[in-house]
């Protein structure tokens, strides 16, 4: 699930990425244009959900995917849109 919150003080949009319990055994990273496809780790919470929040420039569109346990790619069901990537799969889109 994606949640967005405009931070007018810092002129950014804070985007929270959430995945449900059972998504991964070891790790989840959100990998996208906003982190040069390097990956930002999601933290496993006490309730088993995975979460991280990143600050993004407003008025932009970013492609991303989730990398689960270092080997499995997932798209975001609540993404703003999807675009086909060079590997024939969909990347998720978040618009700020």
What is each model feature region?
Residues 1-13:
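Extracellular ectodomain segments of secreted/surface proteins
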Residues 12-59, 69-96:
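Aromatic-rich carbohydrate-binding modules that target alpha-glucans
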């Amino acid at each position: 699930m994606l949640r967005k919150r405009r931070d007018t003080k810092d002129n950014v949009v804070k985007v929270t990425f959430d995945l449900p319990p059972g998504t991964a055994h070891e790790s989840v990273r959100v990998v996208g244009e906003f982190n040069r496809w390097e990956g930002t780790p999601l933290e496993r919470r006490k309730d088993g959900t995975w979460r991280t929040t990143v600050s993004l420039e407003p008025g932009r569109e970013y492609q991303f995917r989730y990398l689960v346990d270092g080997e499995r790619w997932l798209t975001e069901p609540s993404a703003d849109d999807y675009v086909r990537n060079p590997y024939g799969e969909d990347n998720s889109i978040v618009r700020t």
